[in-house]
């Protein structure tokens, strides 16, 4: 076996045909990070017949006195269950890096440690604890089961698969389902952006991360060449908001009148308690509908063409989507734009045949007892 440096094209050819591939081990991601404080190496291990058996992108950070450290994002591209192959690759990689003044290299492999439910409890399914044990055995230092976002990539990720629109919707909590319905009633619609939309997108997400505008401009330029990134916006269509608000008001007004009629017809009855309760509930709902009509009318006067209220960036690769970052205008929070945005994006890609949806990193604070 021999470890060699390969071209970006050779690496991409290997990565594209590798079974367990991921977005972070691509030429495109390497090119992006090359513009943002890292250098990039593309390495492969080949056998005596010249066949590549493993490969990795290494991002390189230079330190003082010529020393460096490396990071293999979600790497390597290797069969982690083949311990002999893994050990050989590690030895060759160590030799390669030592010759080039590397102090260390970090890895966070794209493997699931154990299957867990949404509360973090271990459930029957995947168990890759033997891989972790083997990595430690051959010289890797395990930095621990972090709970938050201490590492370069989050440990905890919310991932879902779905078979139908109904199945997808049912997977959300009752609270989120209600917010999605609310956004729909208030005239939120989804628009797709392009390279010219990046500045508008950035204005909605700049407070959520330290990345600057240039990072997203570069991302759209580099990943856009391979159709790996999409920008989506949530727009409050104020004309539609008025229309829907009036429709809901008229429907509730009709229902309220019917309850009034029912109450008049049963005024001398001893069985009016339930009718009165329904009347009180309808009065509250009718008043809310009226306020929505007033609010929609005022918004239409201010934004006759509608207003962008939320945005989300999505990475698409290998029939998976990754929600990279999202944001919304705080003053329009009550319209639940990002809940609706995420749901509609997920439903769109489900119909396009995408099988896994990564909802981005989550904290493990509520899972301290199950690390």
Which positions does each model-derived feature cover?
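Conserved acetyl-CoA-binding loop-helix of GNAT-fold acetyltransferases
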Residues: 84-95, 334-347
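A conserved beta-strand-loop-helix scaffold within acyl/acetyltransferase catalytic domains
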Residues: 4-49, 55-66, 139-151, 163-166, ...
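Short, flexible/disordered intra-domain loops and linkers
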Residues: 83-84, 112-129
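Conserved small/polar residues in nucleotide/adenosyl-binding loops
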Residues: 370
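Short, glycine/charge-rich beta-strand/loop segments that flank catalytic centers
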Residues: 102-119, 141-158
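Catalytic phosphate/metal-binding cores of nucleic-acid and nucleotide-processing enzymes, i.e., regions
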Residues: 71
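Conserved GNAT acetyl-CoA-binding A-motif
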Residues: 98-116, 350-361
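Short catalytic/ligand-binding loop motif for oxyanion handling, primarily in non-cytosolic enzymes
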Residues: 63-68, 80, 112-117, 241-243, ...
């Amino acid at each position: 076996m021999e470890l060699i440096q390969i071209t970006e094209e050779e690496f991409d050819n290997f990565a594209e045909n590798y079974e367990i591939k991921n977005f972070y081990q691509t030429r495109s991601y390497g090119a992006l990070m090359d513009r943002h404080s890292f250098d990039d190496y593309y390495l492969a291990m080949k056998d005596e017949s010249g066949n590549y058996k493993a490969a990795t992108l290494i991002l390189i950070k230079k330190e003082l006195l010529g020393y460096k450290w490396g990071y293999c994002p979600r790497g390597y591209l290797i069969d982690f269950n083949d311990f002999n192959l893994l050990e050989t690759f590690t030895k060759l990689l160590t030799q390669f890096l030592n010759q080039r003044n590397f102090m260390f290299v970090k890895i966070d492999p794209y493997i699931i440690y154990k299957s867990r439910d949404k509360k973090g409890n271990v459930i029957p399914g995947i168990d890759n604890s033997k891989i972790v044990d083997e990595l430690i055995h051959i010289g890797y230092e395990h930095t621990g089961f972090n709970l938050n976002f201490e590492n370069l990539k989050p440990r905890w990720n919310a991932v879902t698969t779905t078979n139908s629109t109904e199945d997808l919707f049912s997977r959300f909590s009752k609270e989120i389902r209600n917010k999605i319905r609310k956004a729909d009633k208030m005239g939120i619609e989804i628009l797709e952006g392009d390279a010219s939309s990046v500045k508008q997108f950035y204005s909605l997400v700049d407070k959520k991360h330290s990345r600057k505008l240039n990072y997203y401009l570069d991302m759209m330029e580099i990943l856009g060449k391979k159709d790996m990134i999409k920008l989506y916006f949530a727009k409050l269509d104020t004309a539609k908001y008025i229309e829907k608000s009036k429709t809901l008001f008229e429907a509730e007004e009709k229902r309220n009148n019917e309850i009034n009629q029912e109450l008049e017809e049963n005024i001398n009855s001893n069985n009016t308690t339930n009718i009165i309760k329904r009347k009180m509930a309808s009065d509250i709902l009718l008043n809310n509908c009226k306020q929505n009509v007033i609010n929609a009318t005022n918004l239409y006067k201010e934004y006759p063409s509608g207003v962008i209220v939320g945005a989300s960036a999505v990475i698409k690769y290998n029939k998976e989507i990754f929600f990279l970052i999202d944001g919304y205008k705080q003053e329009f929070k009550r319209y639940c734009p990002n809940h609706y945005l995420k749901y509609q994006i997920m439903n769109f890609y489900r119909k396009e045949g995408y099988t896994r949806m990564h909802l981005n990193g989550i904290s493990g604070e509520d899972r301290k007892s199950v690390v």
